[in-house]
Each structure stands twice: as C-alpha cells, then as structure tokens.
C-alpha cells in the first residue's frame, strides 16, 4: 500500500484542548475525530486510549507528554494537541512546544470552572493564545437548565477577567461521551459539529511566517576582505531582498544598514525568506559593530527592551534543574534566540521563593536590551545549564 500523499489544499491551524483535570478534554478530542470522520471526507477517528497514552517528548530538556491528532473540517485542516496531565499543559504552553493558534476550553457543566480551568485561561493569556471557544461538557449530568446558565455566566466572567472576549466567545453545550457512544445527537454529534463550526469561524487564521515582517537572529559575523561584513542566521519571519534597508536591533543602539547581498549554500540569491539559512552582506557596518544576539529586522518592526513580565516554568531537579529554590534578587542568564543576557528577577507580590517544578509570573530587568515582542520564548540558564523556560507576556520598558 503506497503512502497517501498529503495534499494541503485547506488553510492549516493549530489548536488544543485545555481545562481542568477530568472535565473531558481527551474524550472531546476523540469525539471530534469520530464525528468528523463520519461527516467530512479525509478524516480518521482516533480512540480515547490512543490519545491518552501520549508519548513523552523533550523540548529544551523539559519532559512533556503530548498527544497530537489531525483532522479537517470543510474549510480548514487542524493539528490538535491534547496533554494528559496539568503539568504537561503548563510546560507545553510556556515552551511553545506545541504552538496554539487558538484553544478549546473544556468545562464540565456539573462542576463549573475549577482551579485549573482558571489557571489555563491565565496561561493562555500569558503565552499569547489569541482566543478560544468553550465546550460545556457533561450537560446530561445537569437536570436544571438554570444551573447551566449560571455555569456559562461564571465562565464568561473568568474569560473577561483575563482580557478575553468573555461576552462573545461561543459556548457550546454538549456531551463528548454521547458523541462517542453515538446517542442523543442533540448533545452528541450535533454539538460537536456546532463546536467545530464555531472553531472555524471564531479562531482567526494565523498569519504565516512568510507574511510577517522580516526578522533574522544573528548567529555569526564575518568580515570578507574587499566586500565587507556578513551576518549569518536562519530567517525567522518574512522576506529580505537585496537592496533593502534593515535595522540591526538589540544589545547596542539600533543601526540602519542596507543588505547588499544574500548568499545561501555559497550561491547568490536575490532574496532570503523565512526558513532559509543565509549570509547577508551589510553595507557600511564594521565587523566589530555587530554581534551574535542582535537581530536583523525590517525597519520599525521590532524594538529593543530591557524590562518585561513573563510566565516561567522552573525545571524540576529530575529534569536537570536547580535542587534548591531561588529568591528575590536572583540573577541568572536569559537566553534569547542566540545569546545569553544577565537579568534580575522580581518575584510576584507575596511570593518569597520559587521552587523547582513551579510555574510563576516573573518580572525581569536585563542588563542589555534585546529585540522583543510579547510571545518571545527564552530559556533561563546558570553557567550554560538550563534551569527554566519562559515566554514574554508584556514589555514594560
């Protein structure tokens, strides 16, 4: 049997299920694949057991279990990530191991929003998940329709509290189990189809890396006699054409220059684009004026900053992290893209110390500015050893 060729004709989107333990995230994931397999061509059902025994992956030295399934609606192709345990969600969202363009928040109608429901909403906000759709699961366990309304109000309140559009986010009530067992279509199959229609409509199509402004983290700098300075790196987003003006941002004062040549595998190109490993020849900049850790970027598209708030996961001892907690005035290195910068940590009010294995909101002051936007991932290191992973939530200075 020849392997089926993957024809990508539909736009692609990455989503995931989030929510409190045992509210039905994995059952819902299985139900979506089953209902779509029966209703939209090109889908295969994945059963609960196969999603639940998610393989362990290592992302930046952190052990994370995640299950990936794929499916498609009439209008989109989806990659869907589901995690077995709460700790896996925390690590996954902070490291960006599984990118989420949107999320399906699963809440059990019988319980309403629980501590992890709230924590996942906050995490989604902190790591830059743009929006979510809610599936109110297990509605067959509620006899009183008024209770359902109360739970819905409570969920909307939690979403608004974290600056999501709580008033308008679609909340679809149903039962993942009914859908899996093929009974009570109004809360089973039909609810799942309604949910996916809401996901199609409500979760915006992500911008492709190619369509974003040009950015290339600088990995190395060479000087070529008679030609000038060449910076090398992998283009992260956008396109750079020969003759275009760019900025060198971070660490030192921002400098403008012009890309006079683009080279890849020793061949000259007229442009470099997202995903390419290139050497860019830049005009009028000395070898000693550029360094690893800066970025080459479209003018005005990104600015350097020293202070930011972040969501951080601190590696446990078993993951090779610290064996002891850290306190206020902790000064590790923050590794952004290609380089380490020392920074001072400010703990949240009322927090005395942070233990290995915790996740925490930290404010950071760097000793040198780095080109950054919210959503930028970083590692926290001590003498070259990774002790934490984080993501910029807001830029403050």
From Swiss-Prot:
SUPFAM superfamilies hit by this protein: EF-Tu/eEF-1alpha/eIF2-gamma C-terminal domain, P-loop containing nucleoside triphosphate hydrolases, Translation proteins
Enzymatic reactions: GTP + H2O = GDP + phosphate + H(+)
G2: annotated span: 61-65
Disulfide bridges in this chain: none
Positions that bind GTP: 19-26, 82-86, 137-140
EC number: 3.6.5.3
InterPro entries: EF-Tu_GTP-bd, EF-Tu_GTPase, EFTu-like_2, EFTU_2, G_TR_CS, P-loop_NTPase, Small_GTP-bd, T_Tr_GTP-bd_dom
Ranges for region G3: 82-85
Start and end residues of each stretch annotated as G4: 137-140
Region (G1): 19-26
UniProt KW keywords: Cytoplasm, Elongation factor, GTP-binding, Hydrolase, Magnesium, Metal-binding, Nucleotide-binding, Protein biosynthesis
Subcellular location: Cytoplasm
Ranges for domain tr-type G: 10-207
Region (G5): 175-177
GO MF, any single term: GTPase activity
PANTHER family in the record: ELONGATION FACTOR TU, MITOCHONDRIAL, ELONGATION FACTOR TU-RELATED
Family: Belongs to the TRAFAC class translation factor GTPase superfamily. Classic translation factor GTPase family. EF-Tu/EF-1A subfamily.
Function: GTP hydrolase that promotes the GTP-dependent binding of aminoacyl-tRNA to the A-site of ribosomes during protein biosynthesis.
Quaternary structure and interacting proteins, as annotated: Monomer.
Protein name, entry field: Elongation factor Tu
